Structures are given as structure tokens and as C-alpha cells.
Amino acid sequence: MRLGLKIASLAIVFLILGCLGGGETETGQKTAKLIIFHAGSLSVPFSQLESEFAKYAEKELGIKVTFQDEASGSVKAVRKVTDLGKKADIVAVADYTLIPQLMVPNYTDFYVLFATNEIVIAFTEKSKYADEMLKNPDKWYEILAREDVSFGFSDPNQDPCGYRSVMVMKLADLYYGKPIFETLVEKTTNIYANGTHIYAPKEIIVKDKRVVIRPKETDLVGLVESGSLDYFFIYKSVAEQHNLKYITLPNEINLKDFSKADFYKKVSITLGSTGKTIYAKPIVYGITVLKDAPNRELALEFLKFLLSEKGKEIFRENHQDFLTPPVAFGNVPEEIKGLVEIKE
């Protein structure tokens, strides 16, 4: 039995090595590089995941793996492949629907839903009215509207956290029965709404110096930490990872609660960057290995590692909930079929 397992393991290793297109070190060890484009909110868990996978690959597969790791807004991550023609092995996004919308069938034929999150409002003790925000979180929209308070969110055209943030503010209109979107978004930017449908022009213009927009949500972390920005809309996992103070929002607007999906989808947004319309829905992350991945077999090994108990543990340690089980769509590779629930 053990001999059979060893032979099977060796066969897998040789198969991977034969498909790598990598090189060798001076000592003859196989080397390979994985190119990963991922959402900024995945930076911390992916850094740890890559470190642990490198150890695993060297020990179990005999491969010294290096990473070309590029964090950006998820829309930008996808467009690096679809619009700029850049090569990548793996694309991981904060909104799984970007993969079937923009990448299937030309660039990939499967994807996996693997993690969740929620939108919160983060700040520090330096932020104006921080104590009041903590004591009266239901007044968040009143505090953000004050003339001496600055707040930010990421660019809806580049980053799901951005379009989710503005949809959260439109959902807040419905939940609180007050013109929160008009006050916080329409009066301060050129993003506008017709009823519950939002339009984000290709070039976002900020009309109020109190509002800051950056390409991805993690670009705003340093501004808040330094005290140059009071508040920003961010994923809970990122707020936790950076030890920021934050308030949670009602389940009706935080995009966390799957039982509220029918309420969420009342709001939608059309992005000027892609022309696509996106409906508000519970936050679910997605990942895929591309058809023409330079190191496809090794990329699938990385995906297996992410979906393993070790991968789930890394996400839990970084305050991000893992889907149980992860859900896969499309032409799901044999290598991961035992780790996911396959849906049509």
C-alpha cells in the first residue's frame, strides 16, 4: 500500500515537472514561477498562503517555487488578462461573478467560490468623532455627512469593494428611508443613481475634498492609519488584519447575509469601465486557473493547497470566512473535484 502511494506520488511529481516550463538551480533542483493576479483584500492571506505553499512544493514536489504576485482591484486584475493580454496562472477576485462575466469561455472554463466577507466602516482613534461612532453606530451616515469629516472608498470601476460601497449607501436609502446616497455620493462625486440603479462613469470625478477615492480598498488603509482620512468603507477582514476600529452595518446593507439576497438585489450598478451591470448580492470571492497558464499543473497544485485544511486555516486566522464547502462551476479539473461541491 505504501509502495503504491509512493509510486503514485512520484508519478504526480513527474507529471508536474514535465508541464512546468521552469528551470533548475545550480544544484539541479527544479524551479518554477507562479503568476498570481489577486484582489487587494486577499494580500495578507495570499502572502501567507504563498509562503506555506513554497515550503510544501519544495518538500513534497521537489520544486522551488517563486511568485509574481500582483494585487489590485479585482476588475483591474481581470482586465490585465482580458484587455492587456498579460499572462497569469491564477486570478483571484473579491466578486466571483467577474470570472463568468468577463473571463469565461475565452480565458478560463471553470471557477471556484471559496470565501466570504462583509462591508464595514473602519477608522482609528484619531478619526473625528471616533468615540461617537463607536457609541452610536446607527448614526454613521450623519457623522460621514459632517463638513469636517473625510471619508473614502475605492474606485467602483476597478474594485468590487468600491462598487459594493456605493451600493451599500444606496441600500441604506431603502433601509433607513433617508437620502443617504444623494448626500454621501451624488453630491460629492459624479456617480449618480436613477431610482435604485447606480451609474459609475468611466472617469470618476470627486467634487468634494472631504471624499477620497483610490484604485483599491487597501490603498486607503495608510491614509486612515496616518490620520489624513477619517473613515473608509472596507471589508471586515482587512479592518481586522490591520487592527483598525470599525463598526458593523445592519445585515440588510452589509452584503454579508445570504438570507437578505432578495433585498440586496434591489440595487444595481453599471460600470463605465466594462459596460456591465452588477446587482448587489452577498460577498463571495472567486478563483480560477487560466487556460493558457504558463504553469497550469503547478497552479492547480496551488489551488488544491488553498482549498485544503491548511489553506482554510490561513483564511480563518486572517478573519475571513471560508465557504463550506467551496463551490465550483464549469469544467472542473479532476485535481480539485474532491475538495469542492460542483454545481451546473
From Swiss-Prot:
One GO term of the biological process aspect: molybdate ion transport
Record's bilayer topology term: Peripheral membrane protein
Pfam families in alphabetical order: SBP_bac_11
Positions annotated to bind tungstate: G40, S41, S74, D159, P160, C161, E217, Y235
GO molecular function, one term: tungstate binding
Presence of keyword Transport: yes
UniProt-annotated binding residues for molybdate: G40, S41, S74, D159, P160, C161, E217, Y235
SUPFAM superfamilies linked to this entry: Periplasmic binding protein-like II
Localization annotation: Cell membrane
Keywords carried by this UniProt record: Cell membrane, Membrane, Metal-binding, Molybdenum, Signal, Transport
Domain of life: Archaea
Signal peptide: 1-25
Family: Belongs to the bacterial solute-binding protein 1 family. WtpA subfamily.
Subunit comment: The complex is composed of two ATP-binding proteins (WtpC), two transmembrane proteins (WtpB) and a solute-binding protein (WtpA).
Protein name: Molybdate/tungstate-binding protein WtpA
Organism from which the protein derives: Pyrococcus abyssi (strain GE5 / Orsay)
Name of encoding gene: wtpA
